[in-house]
């Protein structure tokens, strides 16, 4: 049975959980790593600061449609409503593409299909709702599980960023993987027909 997720609006409680999850080095390394000064890296906002942000600051991060590139930040929930992670889409309407970033913060749920379900939900949104042409990800080479998942779904290797990620005292490459709208249509059809395992 396929794991199911719901993409939902972010709450302050969700941000607090994200901040707590990122304190775990294993979780933060699979997300964006750590800044050179040691704090967990996070795109779009700093979780600890956002917990107490005023309404204007909150809206600038989570509801500002004029920010370029437009960043859509969503909480990932199980079908029963339990918060388990975060999905971000950096949307460039002029280019017709969106970069995906997915975090399942609950480690005990890793390798149980929630990341895959989140990617599929994001792809549905990118291609069906937004009508974009391309989706892409930037995956550090040491996160082999993520790369395998994206490639299993049909993402294609588009390039390598050399030594772009600091990790364990060294620099590592990251890979750019992409999917085009017509490739997603084939994936979606094969999932609905049961000919593609997820």
Can you describe what each PLM-predicted range is?
Residues 111-125, 147-152:
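Conserved acetyl-CoA-binding loop-helix of GNAT-fold acetyltransferases
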């Amino acid at each position: 049975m396929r794991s199911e997720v719901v993409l939902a609006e972010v709450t302050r409680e969700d941000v607090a959980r994200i901040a707590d999850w990122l304190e775990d080095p294993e979780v933060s390394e699979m997300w964006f790593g750590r800044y050179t000064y040691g704090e967990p890296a996070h795109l779009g906002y700093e979780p600890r600061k956002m917990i107490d942000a005023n309404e204007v600051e909150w809206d600038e991060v989570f509801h500002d449609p004029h920010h370029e590139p437009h960043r859509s930040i969503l909480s990932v929930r199980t079908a029963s409503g339990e918060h388990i992670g975060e999905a971000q889409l950096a949307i460039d309407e002029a280019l017709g593409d969106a970069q995906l970033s997915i975090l399942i913060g609950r480690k005990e749920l890793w390798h149980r299909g929630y990341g895959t379900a989140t990617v599929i939900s994001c792809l549905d949104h990118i291609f069906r709702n937004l009508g974009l042409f391309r989706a892409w990800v930037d995956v550090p080479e040491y996160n082999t599980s993520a790369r395998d998942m994206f490639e299993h779904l049909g993402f294609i290797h588009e390039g390598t960023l050399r030594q772009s990620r600091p990790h364990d005292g060294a620099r590592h490459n990251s890979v750019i993987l992409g999917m085009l709208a017509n490739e997603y249509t084939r994936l979606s059809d094969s999932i609905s027909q049961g000919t593609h395992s997820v």
